[in-house]
Amino acid sequence: MIGRLHGKIIEKQPPEMVIDVQGVGYEVLLPMTSFYSLPQVGEEATIFTHLVVREDAHLLFGFAQKQDRTLFRELIKTNGVGPKLALAILSAMSVSQFANAVENEELAKLTKIPGIGRKTAERLLVELKGKFKGVAQSDFFEEHSVETIVATHSHDPADEARDALVALGYKLADAEKMIKKVNKAGATSEQLIREALKASL
């Protein structure tokens, strides 16, 4: 199991990055909540990882904080929630927002996330309710500052933001509408994604 990577960021294309660790480039998928805090391309970063082994691929998922990975691991244990859906959940909400939604049984909030219908949302409530109460504060609710968002190398931030939302499970038409609502001159793709996700909840 690869649990942690430290190296130089050589590519950033939401929701994916490539990190060079001693000459080996690892492709890593990150939730947008973690992607926002990445430093610039060319700078060093440390990410916590979870390796998913499938018949057709080995997928590496990365997280800025341990508590994000802890929640990811809880989510993929839930029946009907795969790694891609867990990534979409963590992109739409912070760990504390998700925990509050589950503890307060806010079904409507959960069903706004792409890929989560009423049945899946109900299953999440049943299987995860109460789990957050016994978890150590440091595991789930560690406060951390988000670094300044840095523009990624892109021809059109709006197109890049739209593609990232599609990669997270949104339909193309919905992603285009979401970006159109928040698009403004000078905004980076990461800012547009953040605003679009915030507006959708």
UniProtKB/Swiss-Prot annotation:
Residue numbers spanned by region Flexible linker: 144-154
Q: Which family does it belong to?
A: Belongs to the RuvA family.
Keywords for this protein: Cytoplasm, DNA damage, DNA recombination, DNA repair, DNA-binding
Task: Specify the domain of life of the species encoding this protein.
Answer: Bacteria
Q: Which GO terms describe its biological process?
A: DNA recombination; DNA repair
Q: Name one GO cellular component term.
A: cytoplasm
The name this protein goes by in its record: Holliday junction branch migration complex subunit RuvA
Q: Where found?
A: Cytoplasm
The UniProt comment on domains reads: Has three domains with a flexible linker between the domains II and III and assumes an 'L' shape. Domain III is highly mobile and contacts RuvB.
Region (Domain I): which ranges? Answer: 1-64
Cite the residue spans of the region called Domain III. 154-201
User: How is this protein organized at the quaternary level?
Assistant: Homotetramer. Forms an RuvA(8)-RuvB(12)-Holliday junction (HJ) complex. HJ DNA is sandwiched between 2 RuvA tetramers; dsDNA enters through RuvA and exits via RuvB. An RuvB hexamer assembles on each DNA strand where it exits the tetramer. Each RuvB hexamer is contacted by two RuvA subunits (via domain III) on 2 adjacent RuvB subunits; this complex drives branch migration. In the full resolvosome a probable DNA-RuvA(4)-RuvB(12)-RuvC(2) complex forms which resolves the HJ.
Residues spanning the membrane: none
Specify the species: Actinobacillus pleuropneumoniae serotype 5b (strain L20)
- Which GO-annotated molecular functions does the record name? ATP binding; four-way junction DNA binding; four-way junction helicase activity
What does the record give as the function of this protein?
The RuvA-RuvB-RuvC complex processes Holliday junction (HJ) DNA during genetic recombination and DNA repair, while the RuvA-RuvB complex plays an important role in the rescue of blocked DNA replication forks via replication fork reversal (RFR). RuvA specifically binds to HJ cruciform DNA, conferring on it an open structure. The RuvB hexamer acts as an ATP-dependent pump, pulling dsDNA into and through the RuvAB complex. HJ branch migration allows RuvC to scan DNA until it finds its consensus sequence, where it cleaves and resolves the cruciform DNA.
Q: Please give the InterPro entries that the UniProt record associates with this protein.
A: DNA_helicase_Holl-junc_RuvA_I, Hlx-hairpin-Hlx_DNA-bd_motif, NA-bd_OB-fold, RuvA, RuvA_2-like, RuvA_C, RuvA_C_sf
UniProt-annotated stretches for the region Domain II: 65-143
